[in-house]
């Protein structure tokens, strides 16, 4: 883990700056750019979902014996949302899935128990366009239905303006632009690039 140079990290009124990773993982969901990083390949789909579920629901070491029939039915219900047929493959190792299927599964795992914040680190960048759209649409649906606070990192300017209600632009580790509300609603990619040029003193290609 990396620690901040200065300041505090406060989530829902609680200082989590130096909180242990296994503690804050109960309230923070995250997806990496690499679709292979969010799941355990040698464990089954059901076991991966059980790990995510138990991690968020229990305060002590979790054991698979705590997963009951009702929990497994909930797993199937969540998997059916993907429309990928994974609800009928729960006993298969995750390593047999495609990158897109694994990323979609990771999204379900990260939101199975609603987190206080969901962190998305370019989570569709490594996927083919069709799969990326499917995962992004599912992300939008889950975030909207559960009213989850979400922070998404992207290099896609269209996504930066289309998704969410606030756009931040960074340069060399510093936030140089923060737009929301009516100003953001009327912005185009060209406007965003121009604002970046004004704030950063240099041009950026889209």
Sequence positions of predicted segments:
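ABC ATPase NBD Q-loop/coupling interface
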Residues: 8-24, 65-66, 181-184
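H-loop/switch region of ABC-family ATPase nucleotide-binding domains
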Residues: 154-155
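ABC ATPase C-loop
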Residues: 110-111
